[in-house]
């Protein structure tokens, strides 16, 4: 069924395992509390005493106030207000400007994609092959996995040990390095 939701791509039908990376923007409050609790202990264990109070206060500001402010959603209205606020603040100092509800969705998916990349590198380190798939029916995938409304499917990764050259259709094509890299 997962293979069908992935548009019957060969990698899904030949893979030993399929890993689906899911975003949960709806859990931002509990995740922020979890990270804040962890960071308080982390600072107490690893920071000099004279710096602990300020570092804990900084984490409380970020995870207790800023994260809930950035990730809260309400029919696009909160995102619009954040955009107006950042435009005003941005007149006087540098500020992160990607704060609309759509922007925050992109941030969540980008963070999840970085976790997926780390997963694929770790799998390669253990001798396994991976194939990330972006072509899939996200609505069907959510239904198959019984994911809640607030969840989003970020990426599907086929995993296993390659069977020779099966599944390899030809040479890889890549954009030239100097077309995507610019030294500043």
Which positions does each model-derived feature cover?
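Acidic, surface-exposed loops and disordered segments
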Residues: 1-184
